[in-house]
């Protein structure tokens, strides 16, 4: 009996570079979550491609959907984003707050801010976003109002400092959300000498111990800390 010829299997789509950054979610599970995501619009898709090509870490669509869902859940109208890069998550926030909402973008790289501005215009959300090119902690420290959501994705060594600024600038019932809190599993290394790992460990401990917040870490991607102000 003649043997059938082996069929060529479809080539599996390779992961974009931004999906490799600090990945905690198990590979097969991450692939499954990614396969379930609805197709993004052309601007978001282009931002994902740009981030992959230029090795710019972004939260990616799986986490971005969580961020947007959380904002919608509390009917957030004001978001302060710390560490916005090219503005990928900023666009998701802008869609969540709606036409009358406001998102503050912060990033220390003027080139990132310029690129983000162009993306915002093309995405039709530029009128909802205020851009600040500079140190996110300094910009936050200058704010007099209380926000519905504060999203923290700055340099990891600064995480403990960020926490000290949050309580007076977040409304009761507001959300303080922080990315990368599982740090590719390195938080399990209690005796780590790495400065970033130690800063995240301290931040997580302080956040859970804080009487101002009720905190849960979601083990999606690289770990997302969601703290509600009480």
Language model region names:
Residues 35-39, 52-66, 72:
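Conserved SAM-binding loop and adjacent beta-strand
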Residues 44-50, 183:
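Short, basic/glycine-rich phosphate-binding loops at helix/coil junctions
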């Amino acid at each position: 009996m003649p043997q059938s010829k082996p069929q060529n299997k479809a080539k599996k789509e390779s992961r974009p570079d931004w999906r490799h950054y600090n990945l905690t979610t198990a590979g097969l599970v991450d692939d499954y979550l990614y396969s379930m995501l609805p197709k993004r619009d052309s601007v978001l898709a282009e931002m994902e491609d740009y981030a992959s090509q230029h090795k710019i870490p972004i939260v990616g669509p799986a986490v971005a959907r969580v961020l947007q869902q959380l904002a919608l859940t509390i009917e957030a109208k004001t978001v302060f984003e710390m560490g916005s890069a090219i503005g990928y998550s900023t666009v998701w926030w802008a869609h969540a707050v709606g036409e009358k909402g406001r998102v503050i973008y912060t990033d220390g790289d003027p080139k990132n801010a310029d690129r983000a501005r162009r993306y915002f215009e093309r995405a039709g959300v530029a009128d909802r976003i205020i851009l600040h090119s500079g140190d996110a902690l300094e910009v936050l420290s200058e704010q007099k109002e209380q926000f519905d959501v504060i999203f923290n994705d700055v340099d990891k060594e600064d995480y403990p400092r960020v926490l000290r600024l949050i309580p007076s600038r977040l409304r009761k019932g507001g959300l303080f959300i922080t990315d990368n809190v599982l740090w590719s599993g390195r938080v399990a290394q209690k005796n780590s000498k790495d400065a970033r790992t130690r800063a995240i460990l301290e931040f997580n401990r302080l956040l859970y111990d804080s009487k101002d917040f009720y905190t849960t870490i979601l083990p999606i991607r690289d770990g997302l800390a969601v703290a509600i102000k009480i």
